Structures are given as structure tokens and as C-alpha cells.
Amino acid sequence: MALAVFVCGVIASRPAGATDTTPLTGDIATAARAVEAMANPSAVNPLVEFPADFNEVTNRKPVVVTTPDGTKRAIDPAGGCSGPAGDTEWDFGPGCRAHDLGYDLLRYAEHKGRPLNQEARKVLDARLARDMHAQCDINPRGHGTRCHATAQLYAAGLEFNSWRQRWGPPGHEPVLAWGFGSAVVVFLLLARLPGLPRRKEGDREPEPSDTPRPRVTNDRYATFLRLAALGLVVLSQSLLTVLHWAGVSANWLWLLTWALQAIPVFYFAGGHANLTSWHAVQADHGGYGRYLSARISWLLRPVLAFVLAWLVLPLPLELLDVDKSRVEMFGRLIAYPLWFLGLYLVAVAATPVMAWLHRHARLVTPVALVAVMIVVDALRISLHWRTGGYLNLVLGALLLQQLGFHYADGSLHRISRKVLGALALTAVPVLLALITFGGYPRTMMTLPGEGSSNLSPPTVCLLVLGLAQISLVLLLRPRVTGWLAGHRQWRVVEYARSAPMTVYLGYLTVLAAVIGVLGLLDAPAAFDWVATRPRWLTVLVLLLLPVLLVFHRFERNAALSPSRTRETHRTRLAVTLGAGYGVLGVLGFVVTGFAGAAGTLLVFKVDPLQNLIHLLLGWYLLHTAHAGTCHGRRPWLLTALACVPPLLVLEPTGAMVVLHGATIAAALLAAIPKQYQARTTEHRQPRPALQHP
């Protein structure tokens, strides 16, 4: 476990490599020739190959020395070996100083705007390895074997560090943040290993046998809608990809996206489930902490398994010499759809507040959300306001969830079929008018070859389409409900219902393997591609089965552990921080991918290692609230510890300092034991907890 997590941390900390393959020119070409001269020393002065402004740009003053073999070497007098023994007793110093100057050439090229390719750093590292072994032959000092072993150790450490930096320009990295962060990842996982204390007896609420628990109302049609919408998202992405391979033009595919875009229906049906669960928790005398810990824990668990798997996967891919640019594209491709889950976590967390608004302002709330979305969309277009797109994502999810609330309380059932039909039919001319005269994109999903879509970022067109889809599903409700009354049909739905996230994440896994590993999108030949390569069909089937089994195990185990804990201020703090950091981790991977490149999520500067820590911290805090261990001191001390690595980066942003500093302060306060906590627990009248619906 610890070894796997360490590998995750190493891979997550790796920066993205350079991918520019255009010919070198000017000072960059001169720097490349200088590197070549450094890697192949001769009797010629290598400084004649250096760029004219090298000393000024790098603030270095290289000198030339003559080695015992008669070659001239350019060195950095201030350099030296960075190993634990320094230049060593065999004097590896000249080779290390020449190597340091070669690294300065790599930094010079990066400063000029065009990093040299991987081969430049590889030849410099190989030159240093040969120099150290040559020094052992020239001056073994009576310990030739030990000298060669030391040289080999230095060379291995050098190669590992270059591999970790993707053989790109060497830079000053937050090694302390990386090492501390990897340790925190290990601690967060070890805190959940079997055999460790889970909860105190005083934290568990007894379950009286004579007190019945309230049951969640089961709307078969709403359950079917959630699963069908999720399945349609899967099928639509696969279908559009296959059609693109077949060479179908985007001029035809855009119409298909109108019928296949099912995300609005999913959030609509999810709103019904969220409101029903919240009401059930309230009826069971529970609160926000119990609701959120039960509702989000089962979502984050399979997501965490998915992320850990895909953080480790680039290692064997690179060992198999898979093209680096493809691995990086692969990481971003499989991480991007996680926004769908991250946004759903936001909607789940906002349910209690939105339910209060639904109770006190039933009609005003959705109308206000629509108005704000229209204003934000107009500002986004006119001011090129990128953040407006993110804001509309959240507002759109909350609006569709709010409509799901109206379905849950029966309000939408009172709308006549004629009105629903008119709304559905009116959407078509409205969409055509918005696309023709409003300048909106014509596609409702991202398509290859299309510059933009109404999904990324979400626009008014997606809102109109969502309202039309909801009208259609309400029209179909009586007929589909009758069909779902059949025993066989409902058994299929119940089986899929037990692990909906497993289906979604399993699909992402297989899609990523097809596109990223096999590189199908790089060379779409023809529609008969699958038929001409039957061996890949076998590979995909063998890949799909274990993936689904593993993810299903994570999700099934999470669903079988209902909450039986008392709810306190610590519980509510744990679930609030857990949900927030869980969303930050999931959406952070959407921005950065798994390839090691940093990115910006709103005002937060994130990288894959920070994303992993945030996701693990969110999962851990939600688990402590669910299991009742958040009343102890250890979870809060570990929470404070987990917030330290983001503060150790070279240039932490103000937003990250405020977020993690405030979390550390809150965690340390929560770690202080209360004087009368035991007495409060002893006199509290326990109530039965609600099992997750």
C-alpha cells in the first residue's frame, strides 16, 4: 500500500514535458550545439559554441580546464556534486561542474522560450556517468570497486531525478512539499487500514429494536431516469467517438448531440433523490452531518480508487516507451469527465440550503436561477469572462436539481400534458433561433473538429434543451412507470442501482484505455478498424471485467455501512470540510489531468499531488464523520498535517494560504477536548440512524 502511494506521489509530482518538434533556430540552436560539445569533449574549446549572451542570461562565469585525457572541458567553478558525499574522495568534481554547466544550457534554452528535447539532458547525464567511472579508473585510491559502486549510485540517483522531471529543463522544485505531501498521502491511507481503532463506544448510537426507521419513498421512474441518463451519457460518448473514427463529418453529428445530451435529466432525477434523502434524515432526527456523510461517502470511495489507479498507470506506460505526449493527453482525457462527478457533489452538498429555499420560495428560486444564468451568460460572452462559465455550471446544476425538487413534491405532476407537449415542441425553434441569430454553438456536446459547444461552457441553449427534455420525460412517466412494474425489468434496474458510479467510472477506464493506450484518435482509419483487429476486442473485454469488479467492490462496501453516530459540531465541521476538499480534489484533476502539469481552478493553483491530498483528505474526513471517529483528537491533527504541503510550494497563492491556514486553525481548535463532552454524551438520548437509501 505504502509503495503504491509513494509511486502515486512521484508520478503526480512530475511536470509536463516539452512537445514542440519544430526545427531549432537562433540562440536555441546554438545552445543545442553547445550541449553536443559538452557531451562529446575534444581538444577544442567548448565555450566557442556557447550563445553570446549565455553569461548575462544565466549569471554564470564558466572557465575551461584540461582533463588528464587531454580534452578541454567547460565547467562552472561554483558547481559540484550534489550527492551525499559531495565530490567524494575520488574527486568527481570536474565532471560534476561540467554537468552543472550543461544543465545551465538547458535552463538557458527554457528562458529563451524553447526547451531542448529530452535527448539533451540524457546525453549530459550519460557524460557525467562516464566521467565518474573514468575517474575511478584513473584514481581508484586503492578502492576501485567501491569507487565504481559510488559512481553507479550517483548515476542512478541522477537518472531517477531526470526521469522524474521528464528529462526536461532542471528547475528548483518544492522537494520539501513533495516529500511531505507523499508522507501525508501515506498517513491518510494508513489511517483506514484494518486493525486500527475505528470509534469509541460512546460515539455509537444504539439502535432500539422497537423504534422503526423511516423508509425513503421509492419512485421507480425517478430511479430509472437517473440510471438511464447515466447510461445515455456513456453510450453517447462512445457512439460519437466511433462515428468520428468512421469519418462522419461534424456537419451531421451536431444534430445527434441534441438527442444524446442527457446530463440535464441526470441532475433533474438526482434532485429528486437528494431531496428525498434529506427529508428522510430529518424525519429520523438527523442533520446536515449525517446526510452529507452518507450521501457523499459512497461517491468519493470509487472515485478515489479510480484516481489512484490512473496515477499509477503512467509508470508502466512510460516503461513500455509509450510516447510521452500521448501519455499526457491520455491523463487529461480521462480526468476531464470528472467534472460531471465534482459538480454533482456540489449539488448534493447544497441540497439542505436549496431545500430550505424550495420550502420558502418555491417559484422564486428557479426563476431567480434562470435569470442569473442568463445574465452570467451574457457577461461571459461580452466580457470574455471565463469564470462565468464555471459559475453557470454550478447554477445550471442547482436549477435542474430544483426542478427535481418540484417533481419530488408532486408539483410537476399537476402540469397538463398539453402544456408539457407545447414546451417540448417550442424548444426546437427557440434553439434554432439562438444558434442562427444569437451566435451560440450548434453542438450540445464536445465534438472533434468543433471549436466550442453549449456544454463547455454551459450556455442558455443547454438550459432550453434541458427544459424540453424534462417536459418529455414527464410526458412519458405514466407509460414507463407501468412498464417498470414488471418484476424482471425492475430487477435489472435494482442491480444497476447498486453501483451507478461503478458503471460510470468503469466506462471512463475502458474509454481511456482505447483512446490513450491504443492511440485510436491519432489515426482514424475506417469504420472496419475493429473488425481488422479482433485481438484488441479480447483485450478490452479482459480489461473491462476486472475494472468493474474492483470498482463495484468499493461502492458496494461503502453502501453496506450505515451511520450510527451522534451528530455534533465536530461532525458538521468534518462533513463540510470533507465535502469541500473532495470537490476541490475531483475538479482539480479536471484542470491538471494526471500527467503532472499544474493548473488554476478558479483562484486556486493546483497540481496532481495537491489534488490527491485534497481528495484523500475529503474522503477521510467524511469517513470519520460517518464512523463517529471525528470526536477524537487524531483525525483533526492529521487534517492539520494534510494542509501543510500546499503551503510549502515555492510560490503559494494567497487563496491557497487562506484556505489551508483556516483549515489548520479550525482543525487544531477541534482537536482540543471539551471538558464536559463525556457528560453530554452520557445524558444524551440516542436516536436511531438512517441507513443510506
What does each of the following model-derived ranges do?
Residues M1-D210:
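Extended terminal accessory/targeting regions
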Residues A191-D203, R479-W483, V550-S563, I672-R684:
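Membrane-interface capping segments at transmembrane-helix boundaries
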Residues P206-R566:
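Alpha-helical transmembrane segments and their immediate juxtamembrane cytosolic regions
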